[in-house]
């Protein structure tokens, strides 16, 4: 606690430029034509703000999604604590949704059988040419398996980034290994095949806007999506 307080004082007063340089802050917002997550349709046009801080591989970030055109879209607010060293990463995310077990959508209600929170742990490794990630829900409003018990819903993903024709691309394949109502699967199922392209549009000499398009297919649900979006970040 003393170290945290001292760090905050150093930032506020500017006593240590070196310490400030080591602390990374992220403030950004994505605007998307539809909210597609792991091959699932989670809503229509949305703004998705991000606020984060990182120090020597440890990061704490807040992320949200809020529908702009459909009042029925579920609001989301997530907190993620993560650590990265080299290519290895590990983290815990607290997802909160405005729809769930609590009809009053209370954020600070954490009852095991009455909360709108979902807690997920993840582990992964970035090999450079590709990255592997595994995610598992371990508490909160998780889905159910075929026996009607907590499914510990999991998702695994491989992503391959590459550059082609001055555009940054990412090809992704994701699957759900076990039956769960969270993803609507009865067993192992491929739920996410996507290809995303991102290009920065120069506005001024010091400001650019990343614009992206993404094709997403979900073989399990037999659905496909085309998403457009852009990012604002100072």
Regions found by a protein language model. Give the residues of each.
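Outer-membrane beta-barrel initiation region
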Residues: 20-53
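Residues that define the transmembrane beta-barrel architecture of outer-membrane proteins
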Residues: 23-25, 43-47, 73-77, 115-121, ...
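Detector for outer-membrane/organellar transmembrane beta-barrel domains
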Residues: 109-180, 233
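Outer-membrane beta-barrel "beta-signal"
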Residues: 160, 195-197, 201, 222-234
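Cleavable N-terminal export/targeting peptides
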Residues: 1-24
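Outer membrane beta-barrel transmembrane domains
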Residues: 168-203
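Short loop/turn motifs that connect adjacent beta-strands in outer-membrane beta-barrel proteins
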Residues: 20-24, 91, 160-171, 198-211
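Transmembrane beta-strand segments that form the barrel wall of outer-membrane beta-barrel proteins
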Residues: 28-35, 58-68, 90-98, 105-107, ...
């Amino acid at each position: 606690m003393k170290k945290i307080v001292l760090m905050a004082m150093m930032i506020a007063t500017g006593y240590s430029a070196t310490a400030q340089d080591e602390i990374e802050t992220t403030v950004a917002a994505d605007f998307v034509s539809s909210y597609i997550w792991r091959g699932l349709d989670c809503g229509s046009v949305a703004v998705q703000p991000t606020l984060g801080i990182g120090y020597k591989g440890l990061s704490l970030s807040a992320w949200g999604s809020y529908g702009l055109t459909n009042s029925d879209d579920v609001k989301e607010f997530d907190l993620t604590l993560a650590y990265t060293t080299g290519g290895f990463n590990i983290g815990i995310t607290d997802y909160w949704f405005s729809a769930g077990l609590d009809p009053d959508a209370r954020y600070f209600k954490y009852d095991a059988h009455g909360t709108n929170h979902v807690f997920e742990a993840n582990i992964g490794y970035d090999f450079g040419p590709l990255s592997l990630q595994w995610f598992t829900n371990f508490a909160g409003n998780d889905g159910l398996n075929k026996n009607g018990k907590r499914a510990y819903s999991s998702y695994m993903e491989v992503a391959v980034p590459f550059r082609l024709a001055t555009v940054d691309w990412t090809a992704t394949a994701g699957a759900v290994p076990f039956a769960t109502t969270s993803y609507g699967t009865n067993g192992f199922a491929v739920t996410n095949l996507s290809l995303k392209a991102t290009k920065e549009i120069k506005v001024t000499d010091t400001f650019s806007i990343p614009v992206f398009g993404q094709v997403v297919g979900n073989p399990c649900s037999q659905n496909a999506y085309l998403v457009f979006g852009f990012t604002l970040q100072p």
